[in-house]
């Protein structure tokens, strides 16, 4: 829970993609601890249901919807369900994403390029496209998109991932300007090396692989999903009411080296 938390989100509704584990699950739980009811969306039904059950154990309502963010019909159906059950959408965390297989640009397959860009960038666009009209009807809201440290600098062997995450930052800034005057604040978070299942896959899940990844962090450790969740919840709160179109880097100093 955030410091000095007092349930400021009571009666409000949050929509979180990529909620089956990692940053998405931590953020869904953080919204619930702040008083919100939460719609959790993910392609993984088992993990998504586990997140929903944990939210209900916190005393908040939750619904789990299967959603492939590459598919406009899935995104629309998930948000239609949100309105059907809760009647409103106050916050959205567009977080679903996947890691890229390491490959230099010329060796990157078209299929891998399409997979990364369609999930990590197109998915965010589709969520925004269907979330924003619901917030317009409500008179406002707050949206946070997940970019990455790879959204603010380049990384060798990660052309598709870097391009997609830079795209999320650009999309966030453009959309923020489109809707700021309508009381819809849109921002992004740019996590560094966070201890999640995705990072385990990227590092190979071995102690040696993890240590190699940690060696890139000036702070000397991986970040925790809750550290990103706290930032997302803050960006959605009234404390951040003047923060618009910002890409918040949360990376232990990795990108300032």
What does each of the following model-derived ranges do?
Residues 2-5, 99-102, 153, 233, ...:
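Short C-terminal tail/terminal secondary-structure segment
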Residues 7-39:
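Canonical Rossmann dinucleotide-binding motif of NAD(H)/NADP(H)-dependent dehydrogenases/reductases
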Residues 71, 188-191, 208-243, 252:
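C-terminal helical subdomain
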Residues 103-105, 109-114, 213:
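Substrate-binding pocket helix/loop in short-chain dehydrogenase/reductase
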Residues 128, 164, 172:
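Active-site helix of classical SDR
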Residues 148:
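Residue(s) in the substrate-gating loop at a strand-loop-helix junction
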